């Protein structure tokens, strides 16, 4: 990698050798997108494309957060259509998968340490309630996702319609609140969740058939999934969990999102905003 200088923003950023920018092609018409075999993927794509088109400004947004998850695949894809020889913006990943999305779409790659102030960030969610409070962390990237989203001047959520809760968090998402913990503390945290916070159930997330043992985050921590049922006061729950010794971060994103776009298989998009 080598450093180039952004004349518009007066900020240096990382450029990728071997990536040659070409003349910009017209953006894909949202009404003429080729159909996908999976209707759920179509819902994710239309939500992501709409969110980018209605909120991203290549002239003013020079540092863009790119989240993790299956819907953000289409965010990166759409952002890639904005990149040409006259466009100058850098993308900040929230984890390994996010970094690969940025690279595969020939976008400029940066890091949050270099760009602590993010102009706009896009990310998915596991569930969104009526007040735009979120549960995130199903992909085990919650700490870095929260670091980027809270560093952004504008945070936009993209998801398919299944992620929209009719009222409370925990209504649709039944896997619990993801909590990132220091590995040596997991036994203590599990005990405190049950005995101090009356958690219904809590367990360390396992790696599945591909890995023996717990999921390990990009920060080398464990994830605990804690079921509290329907969460009527996510702000207080977040604060209570954060006070437990060993907790790094929770998957409750409070007062962070500005808008949420929910895609439907029929091609419609529902916009929820404060």
UniProtKB/Swiss-Prot annotation:
**Enzyme Commission no:** 5.3.1.6
Name the catalysed reactions.
aldehydo-D-ribose 5-phosphate = D-ribulose 5-phosphate
- Cite the entry's keywords alphabetically: Cytoplasm, Isomerase
Gene Ontology cellular-component terms for this entry are: cytoplasm
Q: Output the CDD domains linked to this UniProt entry.
A: RPI_A (cd01398)
- A Pfam family found in this protein is Rib_5-P_isom_A
Pathway given for this chain reads: Carbohydrate degradation; pentose phosphate pathway; D-ribose 5-phosphate from D-ribulose 5-phosphate (non-oxidative stage): step 1/1
- Biological process (GO), any one: D-ribose metabolic process
Q: Which SUPFAM superfamilies match?
A: D-ribose-5-phosphate isomerase (RpiA), lid domain (SSF75445), NagB/RpiA/CoA transferase-like (SSF100950)
Q: Which domain of life is it from?
A: Eukaryota
Q: What class of enzyme is it?
A: isomerase
Q: Which GO terms describe its molecular function?
A: ribose-5-phosphate isomerase activity
Q: Does the keyword Transferase apply?
A: no
Localization, UniProt? Cytoplasm
Q: Which PANTHER family match?
A: RIBOSE-5-PHOSPHATE ISOMERASE (PTHR11934:SF0)
Family (UniProt) = Belongs to the ribose 5-phosphate isomerase family.
The protein depicted here goes by the name Ribose-5-phosphate isomerase
Which source organism? Kluyveromyces lactis (strain ATCC 8585 / CBS 2359 / DSM 70799 / NBRC 1267 / NRRL Y-1140 / WM37)
